[in-house]
Amino acid sequence: MAVAKILLVDDEVPFVDTMIKRLTKRNMEVLPAYSGDESLKKLAENKGVEVVILDVKMPGMDGIETLKAIKKAFPLVEVIMLTGHATVESAIEGMKLGAFDYLMKPSDIDLLVEKVTEAAAKKQRHEEKIIEAQMQKITTRGR
């Protein structure tokens, strides 16, 4: 069983291909998307995605716009921003918008795997709390 199901969003095909190989070797299930729009479609089609690894600099819908859209439509999905063009301002903006973390390219694969694992665990904890709250409501109504 995979450690985490990831959606990797980057417009650079060679980078995506390399990362899929590296993450798959570490027992991650990875789906590729090459634009912000495609990432939203893939998230809608693949309900089990736990973590999105999202490039900041992309043509069309950039990473910050994509992050906003993901958090609006899929609030429990954790997003790790990954970029080679980071500024302090963009990192702060990403974190304010709900990014789990903000890493530089090229990222150490072990660090990235650690962050993905932490993000997936956070998503699972949030889902468990929601289920617990729903069960509490059902139990309370039944009394």
Where on the chain are the PLM-derived regions?
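Two-component/phosphorelay signaling modules centered on CheY-like receiver
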Residues: 13-32
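Helix N-cap/capping motif at the beta->alpha junctions
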Residues: 32-41, 63
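Receiver (REC) domain active-site loop signature in two-component systems and cognate sites
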Residues: 58
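C-terminal output helix
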Residues: 107-117
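CheY-like receiver
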Residues: 121-143
